[in-house]
A protein has these predicted regions:
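Long, acidic/polar, low-complexity amphipathic helices and coiled-coil-like
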Residues: 130-256
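C-terminal motif of bacterial Sec signal peptides marking the signal peptidase cleavage site
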Residues: 23-26
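Post-signal peptide N-terminal segment of secreted/secretory-pathway proteins
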Residues: 72-169, 178
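Bacterial signal peptide processing site
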Residues: 28-31
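Beta-propeller fold detector
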Residues: 86-93, 124-145, 179-199, 233-238, ...
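Repeated scaffold domains used in trafficking and secretory/extracellular systems
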Residues: 51-59, 91-104, 138-157, 191-206, ...
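Acidic, serine/threonine- and glycine-rich low-complexity intrinsically disordered segments
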Residues: 214-342
Length: 386
């Protein structure tokens, strides 16, 4: 079961004006300098979507899947197998979806809060098999307040939801999201405060530690590991323009810089660069906890308002390399069109309408599927695109 920031094979459907999408399959549940950390009630839930949230719970013969898609005005939840619309939930704002960590709930970020969406599919392990359940999808009012919602990351049995406007992140145990088979009415959280507000992230590590970005509202300069009180344990300041992170095998993590990437494992940071390209930003990455390889974008035009990259990179977290590969001339991709396949394949949905499949070990293109017509990227990052 997924409990980390690996990226699944999913795309948004630009023809419908959709903003973001996330697929969830019912599987067994369960799955940074001076600051302070205090336990709190954190989140509470009232009577929202009452009819849906109290819908019957049905046991099925096998696992079900749900596909949640945001649009300008709400969230639509579909059956992941036959694409039947199950629920159209109204919610204002520019909405983004995140994994809530328990393989049942999603987090809906609207800029000022993280609200929990019950997709209505889950399973319970029972000896050598599992029991599978479904109910109607519903948006609870169980939420976390956040000044400028940003990255939400689940790993090592915890979830950290970052607030860019305050430089704080709330941590919770995803096992506590359910009570009596329904979304819990309260959620205990612990808040960790970093020195300065910034567009950052926090990755839960073992031993109640967190891998975080370091910076302020103007610049981001590196990464650090902090404890539950926000105290720095170790730090690396050699990562200008920090953006993007991914989880790889063996509790290894990659962090994007404007001149390369940082690889973190077992208390040690390693900087990886490509000297032929002094400016080489890999600010978006797609990893999986089952693979040592991380797919990353590769941008080399420092002055471009919008660079449409025609190269991509694969980071080897064991060999400490970032290999660069070229797409056909005139073909590019965006931060939304990167993913990983069921066996760790590197996936790119490119502007020629193809889903390209690569072997991450050597960058070989294994094949492609023509999914749509050619398309181009909008200069407004919030606009929908494949």
């Amino acid at each position: 079961c997924m409990s980390n920031t690996r990226k699944s094979f999913l795309t948004s459907l630009s023809s419908l004006g959709l903003v973001s999408s996330l697929l969830l399959a019912g599987c067994a549940g369960g799955t940074s300098s001076a600051g302070s950390s205090e336990p709190s009630a954190g989140a509470s839930s009232g009577d929202s979507n009452a009819s849906a949230s109290q819908s019957p719970i049905v046991e099925g013969k096998g696992a079900s899947t749900r596909l949640a898609i945001t649009y300008d005005g709400g969230v639509m939840v579909y059956d992941g197998k036959d694409m039947k619309l199950l629920q159209d939930i109204h919610k204002d704002g520019f909405l983004r979806l995140n994994d809530a960590g328990d393989n049942r709930h999603l987090i809906v970020a609207d800029g000022s809060s993280y609200t929990f969406l019950d997709t209505g599919v889950w399973s319970v392990a029972h000896g050598d098999h599992s029991h599978y359940y479904t109910t109607a999808p519903s948006l609870s009012t169980l939420s976390l307040q956040a000044d400028h919602t940003g990255h939400v990351i689940a790993d090592n049995g915890k979830v950290a939801a970052f607030a860019d406007g305050t430089g704080t992140f709330d941590v919770y145990d995803p096992a506590n999201l359910v009570s009596n088979k329904r979304t819990a009415t309260n959620l205990e959280t612990k808040q960790v405060k970093l020195p300065n507000p910034h567009h950052g992230f926090a990755i839960p590590l073992p031993n109640d530690q967190y891998l975080v970005a370091v910076g302020d509202s103007k610049t981001r300069t590196g990464a650090a590991v902090v404890d539950a009180n926000g105290k720095t344990i170790t730090e690396n300041k050699e990562c200008p323009g920090v953006h993007g992170e991914a989880i790889a095998r063996d509790n290894t993590f990659t962090i994007g810089c404007t001149d390369g990437v940082l690889i973190y494992r077992d208390g040690t940071f390693t900087k990886v660069t490509n000297p032929q390209d002094p400016y080489s930003r890999s600010g978006n990455q797609a990893g999986t906890a089952d693979s040592p390889y991380v797919l990353a974008d590769y941008k080399t035009d420092k002055d471009a308002k919008l660079e449409r990259p025609e190269k991509f990179a694969i980071i080897d977290t064991v060999a400490h390399t970032r290999e660069v590969y070229s797409l056909p001339k005139g073909v590019s991709y965006t931060f939304r069109s990167m993913g990983r396949g069921p066996n760790g394949e590197a996936l790119l949905l490119t502007t020629d309408g193809k889903l390209r499949i690569y072997d991450p070990a050597n960058g070989t293109e294994l094949g492609s599927v023509q999914l749509m017509n050619t398309w181009s990227e909008s200069e407004t990052w919030q606009d929908p695109r494949p």
